[in-house]
């Protein structure tokens, strides 16, 4: 259902801070032409935390419109209030999205029981396939494998995006949840190793600027051609690392603009445009990876 290279798509904005739908269409077409396996619209890389509900919904619907059935679209639906996450999930119930990606509630630090009840409420509100998203470095809460296993009992909770970079969790989660439960890496630098150890793919920041390479790498991995995949991975490693030189999505937003993929590098406060000191770092990463000549 979900595998390969899925891009955590940036949300292009104009100089007034409004969504730039012309650039969005260009990004969607770029990923379709590059062979990207799926698009996450309005995930955390897409600045979900600083968009209004109306903007959020319109962005997902426009992404669906622009994709026109040519690529699976996953809607970001996470929130730190359960009722809000439920509302998003209901809004996309009949939209045509392939699934919903819901980050763990951030800042309020729920217990494992709170996380279970949060996702249970979401699951019971919709029949759309749900992807859990664990990124404790950003949320200050860790969705443990034992809790994932409880949630995997719900028919429409089908996958986990794991951004912990703790590769030992793959086997633990597979043992608890079974082989059919989908595990996706949320950490580009360790994503290929994640797949070697039994994962199914990646939800990627790097794919924003190196879509064809990422799609090729994970297609090779799916065929067991890990040596060939590793050659690509090593070339892309500067991006995997330096696209996080400052808080995501600041570097990747600047990088997509530097490559001419979006019209403006603007980003919403409290995030700011990539600092002048970090811009050469990202530019050199683009050059070393072979995506900027």
Curated annotation (Swiss-Prot):
InterPro entries: Aldolase_TIM, DapA, DapA-like, Schiff_base-form_aldolases_AS, Schiff_base-form_aldolases_CS. It catalyses: L-aspartate 4-semialdehyde + pyruvate = (2S,4S)-4-hydroxy-2,3,4,5-tetrahydrodipicolinate + H2O + H(+). GO terms for cellular component: cytosol. Its main location: cytoplasm. It is found in: Cytoplasm. The keyword Amino-acid biosynthesis applies. Its EC number is 4.3.3.7. It is an enzyme of class 4 (lyase). SMART domains: DHDPS. Pyruvate binds at residues 45, 203. Pfam families: DHDPS (PF00701). Keywords: Amino-acid biosynthesis, Cytoplasm, Diaminopimelate biosynthesis, Lyase, Lysine biosynthesis, Schiff base. The keyword Nucleotide-binding does not apply. One of its GO terms (biological process) is lysine biosynthetic process via diaminopimelate. Pathway: Amino-acid biosynthesis; L-lysine biosynthesis via DAP pathway; (S)-tetrahydrodipicolinate from L-aspartate: step 3/4. GO terms for molecular function: 4-hydroxy-tetrahydrodipicolinate synthase activity. The record marks 44, 107 as: Part of a proton relay during catalysis. The active site is at 133 (proton donor/acceptor), 161 (schiff-base intermediate with substrate). Catalyzes the condensation of (S)-aspartate-beta-semialdehyde [(S)-ASA] and pyruvate to 4-hydroxy-tetrahydrodipicolinate (HTPA). Belongs to the DapA family. Homotetramer; dimer of dimers. This is 4-hydroxy-tetrahydrodipicolinate synthase. It comes from Aliivibrio salmonicida (strain LFI1238).
